[in-house]
Structure formats: structure tokens, C-alpha cells
Amino acid sequence: MMRGIDSRHELDPTLLLRDTRTFTQRLADFFADPTNISIVLISLAAVSYYFSEAATFLLIMGGIFFLYSYTRKQKLPFRLPQISRAKDYNDLKPGINKPNIARGITFFGNDRKTGEELWFANDDMRTHALIFGSTGSGKTETLVSLSYNALVQGSGFIYVDGKGDNSLYAKVFSMVRSMGREDDLLLINFMTGARDIVGPQEKRLSNTLNPFCQGSSSMLTQLVVSLMGSSGQSSDGDMWKGRAIAFVEALMRLLVYMRDEGAILLDANTIRNYFDLQRLESIVIDKVFPRDDQESVNIETIPKLVTDPLRNYLNTLPGYNKEKKGKQVSQVLEQHGFITMQLVRSFSSLADTYGHIIRTNLAEVDFKDVVLNRRILVVLLPALEKSPDELSNLGKIIVSSLKAMMAAGLGEEVEGDYRDVILRKPTNAPTPYMCILDEYGYYAVQGFAVVPAQARSLGFSAIFAGQDLPAFQKASKEEAASIGANTNIKICMKLEDPTETWDFFTKTAGEAYVTKVDSFQTKETSIANSYMDTKSSSFEKRARVDLLDLKEQTEGEAHIFFKSKIVRARMFYANPKPVKQLKINQFLKVEPPPDDYLMKLQKQLASFQSILESGDLSINKAVENEEITLISKALKESTIVEPIERGVAALIAFHGQNEPEPVEDIVEEEVEGALTIFSKLRIDPNAPPILVADKEVFSEPLLPINETRNQMITIERLAGAKDKYAGTVANELIKDFQIATSYPPEERDVIDVQELTGIIRDLSAKISAEREKANKKAAEELT
């Protein structure tokens, strides 16, 4: 026996509802639909054809119906498309309640019931969107289709995929290729195919990204802190994490300074190498900055503000004694080890596993460039290859870098011209920059919930997507609640979570009063024992959405919640056509020009601009040049009338006047018992034979004297010197080469032993005195 309810016993809830509106309200609603009025007008025309007597009356009625329908305010569920240029009565100006001109720029899909288009304006998109949908709901296709809006607008987007599916890159590449913007496409692919990436690969896997190559020390510190593991609930864990954060802040202050000075390439591996206590001691005590595979750098002249944090860190290590440099007791090493071990895991993953992406100087992906120049960035996170914690760290790198870029875009100035401080923000654009975070729960970052609140003024449109609400709550329930509260556009696709996610959408939708039939009664005269309602109704409060409706949605169907409206929608499906060949952009690394060159260029451009503004483009400055003077004189004195022949004659005369005197070849004089760099090998006949294949070539001088002289003349000529002067300089240089490489050297001044000993003692005394002064100075700084 089955006690559950069979489907044939289930009632359609809409059959219990009754329309209690007045006749005029229903009539007005009927004629508000253009399809209905079209049917009425066609019907009136057909009736007038058969009943010509009523044609005049029917014409008047048709005109009234048409005018009524024509004068109705045309609306769509959300916004009218901008191309319509009509007044949008769903988009009223605040305070005066006058309609804005249509501003819809982002197409979401169509109403499933009426087929009406669903558009959102720039301001709406910058209030962000939240999408939930279970597996197979069409969530990824919806997000890809939304990103196509950005391409149509000439904008760009960032798409972070927590599932790590390479088919996503293929779809995005197809869309970008169709718009002719494949040069703007960037890919960060953390997927390694379950193998180690060592050395060059046959095919490129990813563009490069180095989050440490730019940004302030505080921004990079926060990035590292976000990668650190949770300290747990213990107070000891909080204490050790706090000390680790203090160490990172102190270290980053110095490393960022040295990076900006061009002394080091700052990446994850470089930072990890400076965890060594001996290196820290060299920096603080010896005032020497050690570098990997390079000479150390003297840092005595850098500001104390940069080195003081590291000095204070060492001084606060329990048991640390600066007098025992390099030989600290085990307690100091343990204390330092407890601090650095909290950082090793994150940096090992970045520097080793993903070194082919992170360990680079001029990275191809610069988030500031990506956002300001509206590029397209796709990030693939390996959900199957990595543990949840590791996957979270990779996502945090992207999200934290994006957050830091947003912080820089907010600006720090509050004083100055309004146009410079406010209107010239780098992201004031008529279209939003989309940040699509698919499966955000896998890589949620603590503190990212403030982004929806701040990103609106920066022109960002953050679209959070996931399968359910509990995934968002892994990082923090408060963060998840804040994201839900700060996203005005909420979309629920196929839903299978009947608990927290369902409660979230139920509360979002709210309740409404409806009129329902009270009861049914049997019709006494009916043989089939049919039921009829009792012609009475009452109202009750019901939820505006039903869980079964959300569960029965097919791929691409969704409920869209915006303000107080709920629209059952069929989402836009871009369906990009696959391309035959996929590729990853490869860029040429070019160092930025130095600051002094930029200042010089700016002055030159300013001077050129002032010349253009003055309107006087003539050059009155006399340039003294002997060649130009000679050619000008020859042209003036020439009696030839034909311009071309006169010019040729002037050039021939100039060439004849400036023809260089022939320079004789220099012959190296062979001095017995002496050698120079221009000497040939002289072989003693009695010496053992030289075991070489070609003795003549082997016996040639290291530098042929005449070829060297000719090359020097060429260099001088390229530098602007005349032939005569160039030959003289070359001969002088050849003589200098001969003197400098002459062997045996000439006898030099002889110094006796006592005098040499005295000089050495004086030098030693001066060195000792300088060292004592340096030690006293260091002791005074520490005290």
C-alpha cells in the first residue's frame, strides 16, 4: 500500500486562484497587449466586410481601440534597450519621477511566458549579480553568454572558472575571434594535466603572471596574508600568525624597495629565499643585501624606514644576540622556524608547481592593464588536480590581485580640482567591466565581500556564481550574507538544495496576497459526481516562488529577481561557433623606459606643443655644419641651370674637397724578445712541434693590425667624425693597444721592503679605525 500522494491527485495551484479584478482593469490589461489589439482590429475589419452597414461604427470602435493601445506606455519587465531611444517608464529619475531615455545595454534573455526581452542598464549591472544553479542547469553557458554582452559593448571581462574546463577557453576564444579581438585575450591556466612542468614545453600552457612584480609592500603583504592558512580557534595560533604577518610586512618593505631600485626580480621564489635567518642578519648587521647568483648590494644609504622593521623583528626574537651573527642558539632558530613554516606551503606551490607562470620578471598579465584597456582574461583553476585548500589559494591570488587593483583605482587624493580628483578616475566608462567568478565558493577570499560595495563606483560588475549557498559560506557566513545583500540582480536556475539556498530565495522573493476559492461541492444533478467551486473566495498570503518550479527548470531557464519583480526567464544563449585552431597570445618583453628619459620626452613634447600652438613653424636657429655650408656654397656658385645636374655637381665638388688622404697600412715592427697583441707567433726551430692542423692560421696575431685600424675608422665615421680625424684617432688607439699589451713590461719604480711594510701598516690602521667607527655607529642606532 502506497501512502504517498500520486501525481494524479496533485492539484495545479493556479486552478485554485481567482481573478478578482474589476472588468475595466481586466479590459485595460487585455488591450495593453499589442497582440490582442491586433486580433481585435483584424476581427473588426472582417466583420465590416460582411456587415457593411456597421462599417462606420466598427471603424470608430477600431480607431478608439487603436488610440488607446497606441497611447499606452510601452514597458519591458526591466529596462528598454538603449537602441530604442524611447522613454523608459521602468527607469525613473530619483526625486522627480521622470523617465530616463532607454539605457538597457546588457541582454539577459526573454520572458518565458510573454517573450519580452530582458535588458539591464549600466547602473543595474554595477549593482552586481548573483547566480545559483545546480549541475546541468546551464549556468556556465549563461555566464559565457553574459560575457558576450561585454564584447558587443567593446569592453572586456575577467572570467575565473573554478571547475577548470578547457572547453571554456575554446568558447571564449571563439567569441573573441568573431569580434576580431583575439589580440586582447589572455589566459592563466593553472592546470598541469597531472604532470610536472619542467623546462620549455612543446606547446604553451599559459600566459605569465607575477603578482609581486608591482604594487606596494602593504598590498603584497595582504596578498600573502590571504594565502596563509587559518590559525584555528586557539590563542597560540593567532599569536603565531600575528608574528608571521609582522615578519612578512617587515620583509616586504625591504624587498619592494630593492625591486623598485632594480636590484632584484621579485617573485615567489625570491621571497622564499629571504626566509633564511643568515640572510636577514647580513641585511641588518652587515648592511649588505645578498642576491641569488649575483654580487651583494651595499644598502648603507637606503632610508632607515625601510630596514628598521627587519631590525626590530630580529631584536624581538627570543634569545637573539647580534654578537653571535651566524651562530645563534637553537631557541632563536626554532622561533624563526615557527614563523616561516606558516609561509612555506603557499610559496612552495607558487614557486615550484606553478613556476612556469609565476617566476617571471615582465609578466604578460597585468591586472591594471587588463581592466583599464578592457582586455579579456580567462583563469582556469584545476578543481580535480588540487585539494580544496590549494585550489582556494590559487583563486585567492587572482581575486586578491583584482581587489588590490580596485583599491588603486579608488584613488587616494581628496584635495584638488574636481575634474582631476573625481572625473578622471581610470574606470569612469559608459559600460561596466565584468568580473565573472564562477564557482566562487571554491576560492572565496576573506574580506572580498566589500568589493560589491566599492566596485560600483569603479565601474565593475561582479557576477558571483555557484551551485549553492553553503559553498559561499565556507570562508565566512558573514561574507556570504554580505555578498547576497550587495547583489541586486539575483538569478536562480535549476535548484536542488531545499535548505539554505531555497530559504535564501524564498526570503528574497517575499510573499504576496492572492485570492483563492474557499471550497468545492458536488453537483447534485451530475451523474459523473463532478465538483464545482462554491462561488466564494478568500485571500491568503503565499510565497511568490515554489520549490518545485525551481526544480523543474530545464537548461537555460531561470527565475530573475530584481527589486520587487520576479521574471521566469529563458536565458540568452550565445552558442559561439567553434574555431578550428586555438592559440595563446605570446608577447615580447620590453622594459619600461627610465624615469629620466620619460621626463626628457615629456619636456620635448611640451616644447613641440607650444610651437604648434604659437603657429610659427619656421626654424630660425642657425645650425653650424661644415658639410652643409660647403654644399650650400657649391650650389650658389654653380652656373648650371638644370637643378638635378647642379645638385650632382655640388655633391661631386663636396666629395672631391673632403676626400680623405690615403692612410698607409701599418706594419708591426718585430722586436726581438717582445710581444704585443698584434704580433705573430714566432716559433723556435729547436722547439717541439705544435700539434695543430693549420700552423699558418694558428700563428696569426690575436688582432690583425690593419683590419682593427679600419674598423676603428668606421666607428669614428659613424660617430660623425671626418675621415682625416677618424684615421688619426685610429692610429693613436693602435699605438695605445701596442703599449698596453707589450710584453715584457718596462721596468717600473722599485720600492724597498721597509717602505712597503710601512705603507701596509698605515693602511691596516686606517681600516681598523674605520671599522671601529662603523661598529660604534651601529651600536648607537640599536640603542
Swiss-Prot record:
For this entry, list what GO says about its biological process: protein transport
Q: Which GO terms describe its cellular component?
A: plasma membrane
The cysteines joined by S-S bonds are none
Region (ATPase domain) location: 100-500
InterPro entries for the chain: P-loop_NTPase, T4SS_component, TraG-D_C
Q: How does it sit in the membrane?
A: Single-pass membrane protein
Annotated stretches, region: Interaction with IcmS/IcmW: 671-773
**UniProt cross-references to CDD domains, sorted A to Z:** TrwB_TraG_TraD_VirD4
Q: Which UniProt keywords apply?
A: Cell inner membrane, Cell membrane, Membrane, Protein transport, Transmembrane, Transmembrane helix, Transport, Virulence
SUPFAM superfamilies, alphabetized: P-loop containing nucleoside triphosphate hydrolases
Q: Show the stretches that span the lipid bilayer.
A: 47-67
Main localization, broad class: membrane
Supply the Gene3D superfamilies for this chain: P-loop containing nucleotide triphosphate hydrolases
* Annotated compartments: Cell inner membrane
Spell out the subunit comment: The T4BSS is a complex nanomachine composed of several subcomplexes. This subunit is part of the Type IV Coupling Complex (T4CC), a subcomplex composed of the DotLMNYZ core and the IcmSW-LvgA adapter subunits, linked by the C-terminal tail of DotL. Six DotLMNYZ hetero-pentameric units may assemble into a hexameric nanomachine, forming an inner membrane channel for effectors to pass through. Interacts directly with DotM. Interacts directly, via its C-terminal region, with the type IV adapter proteins IcmS and IcmW. Also interacts with DotN and LvgA via its C-terminal region.
General function of this protein: Component of the Dot/Icm type IVB secretion system (T4BSS), which is used to inject bacterial effector proteins into eukaryotic host cells. Part of a subcomplex which recruits effector proteins and delivers them to the core transmembrane subcomplex. Plays a central role in the assembly of the subcomplex. Required for the recruitment of IcmS and IcmW to the inner membrane and for the translocation of adapter-dependent substrates. May have ATPase activity.
Q: What is this protein called?
A: Type 4 coupling protein DotL
| Organism listed in the record | Legionella pneumophila subsp. pneumophila (strain Philadelphia 1 / ATCC 33152 / DSM 7513)
